[in-house]
């Protein structure tokens, strides 16, 4: 955490004996693109979005910029799945790189899942062992013990 960062805490007295939910931005904060946020509670992590951004002019030879996966590498055993909000590049563009390294289920709407399939095929990501689940309005999905 940089010296300018602030740690925010909200304490509701009726939840005094519970552990906090950690919100870990992995990209997309203070920038356009690379949207990716991890939510951790006890021994479970879920991720919302896994996007990319386009390189700046001073980055010759770079095709895309992806979020920093370091926190997930250190805590991969807690990872329960990824929720994709929609199929724009800044929300799904880093999935081929992420899913090569981490095998976890991916959940999203019909259009998002179809775009993800095309993206994974385009980037030659092996589909075997990957679980891509289409969700519809009203679906309830459980992740681990916490979510």
Q: Can you say where each PLM-predicted feature lies in the sequence?
A:
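Catalytic core of the metallo-beta-lactamase
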Residues: 22-27, 32-41, 138-147
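N-terminal Rossmann-fold NAD(P) dinucleotide-binding loop
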Residues: 91
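Metallo-beta-lactamase
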Residues: 1-24, 40-52, 111-147
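Pre-active-site segment of Zn-dependent metallo-hydrolases
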Residues: 29-34, 41-84, 97, 101, ...
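Beta-sheet entry/capping signal
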Residues: 18-20, 45, 103-106, 131, ...
